[in-house]
């Protein structure tokens, strides 16, 4: 049985780590390299770095810190933000990232997924889906890194997840925007709905506030990993303690000694 992954998320803006609530009102958390080292040493299974200003501002993320992170940590990490081409992705992977993640650019031009998969393989290509419950239904949103530039698309998350898989992506991160930063728990029903319609790994994002939320998302859905930010940044949850509790609840996880 594959172990379930615990994945701290570091939202990056202007080369520092920030965190908002429901993708808004971001506060500065700290230094990218120091936090990456902290979470790697604590036993995280992967890290995800989102340059949240890159896509809304139509720029490529800053890659100057990627190589340094690759030197400092010994776990896989994924980089996202402003990736619009094979060339953008290659620059990031060449600096030492293990995966790249696309979101808004893939919505604007879905063929980008096919091109990235052809060039680098499915194992390197993650697609983020920002899903928001609006007027009684879930819709995929675009350019969510900026409040005044966020766009609600006509796509529903299940249909888009199916297309993402059909184009060869190796993994989906489902960001439940209504839960983001409020620490009320993952949206188990929505996660189940999307995950049950695809066969590639799905990572839960948005809502973690306590250890029980991680236990619940692994017990009551078939997702492969749980991404979180605030609970780790604010030292609400320590990763070693979280993993011990998952182990006690018969959830397969990698224990770092």
Curated annotation (Swiss-Prot):
Keyword Lyase: yes
One biological process term in Gene Ontology: L-histidine biosynthetic process
Reaction(s) catalysed (UniProt annotation): 5-[(5-phospho-1-deoxy-D-ribulos-1-ylimino)methylamino]-1-(5-phospho-beta-D-ribosyl)imidazole-4-carboxamide + L-glutamine = D-erythro-1-(imidazol-4-yl)glycerol 3-phosphate + 5-amino-1-(5-phospho-beta-D-ribosyl)imidazole-4-carboxamide + L-glutamate + H(+)
GO molecular function ontology, one term from the record: lyase activity
GO cellular component, one term: cytoplasm
Top EC group: lyase
Residues of the active site: 11, 130
Gene3D superfamilies xref list: Aldolase class I
Listed pathway(s): Amino-acid biosynthesis; L-histidine biosynthesis; L-histidine from 5-phospho-alpha-D-ribose 1-diphosphate: step 5/9
Flavoprotein as UniProt keyword: no
Annotated Pfam families: His_biosynth
Entry-linked SUPFAM superfamilies: Ribulose-phoshate binding barrel (SSF51366)
Main subcellular localisation: cytoplasm
Complexes and interactors: Heterodimer of HisH and HisF.
Family: Belongs to the HisA/HisF family.
Physiological role: IGPS catalyzes the conversion of PRFAR and glutamine to IGP, AICAR and glutamate. The HisF subunit catalyzes the cyclization activity that produces IGP and AICAR from PRFAR using the ammonia provided by the HisH subunit.
Protein name: Imidazole glycerol phosphate synthase subunit HisF
Origin species: Francisella philomiragia subsp. philomiragia (strain ATCC 25017 / CCUG 19701 / FSC 153 / O#319-036)
